[in-house]
């Protein structure tokens, strides 16, 4: 059952709640809830919330979220509000910084200290970053992601920012040793699955201009050409690379763009409270030949009365998306 509280200095006040939506996205801080509460019934008024209040959400006695109210939509008898966890302060705050000879965890602690963000356990990331400079105003979140990205490139280890009981933390990314299973006929209630060759390339051509000369490199998928015809992808490369590197890049690009593209999304299922973006999940949908482990990219949990449902999107690899702190 839903338990939603507003936390005051000396007490927790329970809110009369109709529904709660809890959601998050991998590498997109923070997690949030949107709740609909009853504030008035007849002549009787119930507890409400204001911007800046701390709210706590429990489901069947287990805390799933604690965060700060950032927006409200009050009506005559009810109110909808949205609250964010502590990672919101990493997104909202920007500044310029120069870090020298510091680990990613030390950078996190410094930023948290400077911006008065309470912390819980911060894992030692091990690798010392020689220099990290942000000359333009940059969000604290992007600074940290860049530090974590450099750490992964040097150590191969992934780390995850999280918020627990109103405090910012850092932990090693959960591994694949134990995963939840979603399966049609058991707990999956719906999904969208599609296949397409709209973005497939059976031939890749890369060009590079240098000293008024054009250098080209090509790679092709002969079996793909036989099956789908010639579908050529062309790109002009601006990097300062030699012919051998250009050819290697063409081969890599061809490998990325070959074959039928398969997309699995909007997986609807019976709710599992522990599932959230960034976690591994094994999905079995024999009807379309899917039996493998994915990573949860987005999650949205809906709670109403005694019912809990969820919708997730998944990705095959837990890599930092292009354009994120690159």
Swiss-Prot record:
Q: Which Pfam families does the UniProt record give?
A: YQBQ
Q: Which family does it belong to?
A: To B.subtilis XkdQ.
What the entry lists under InterPro entries is as follows: Bact_Kbp, YQBQ-like_dom
Question: What organism does this protein naturally occur in?
Answer: Bacillus subtilis (strain 168)
According to UniProt, the name of this protein is Uncharacterized protein YqbQ
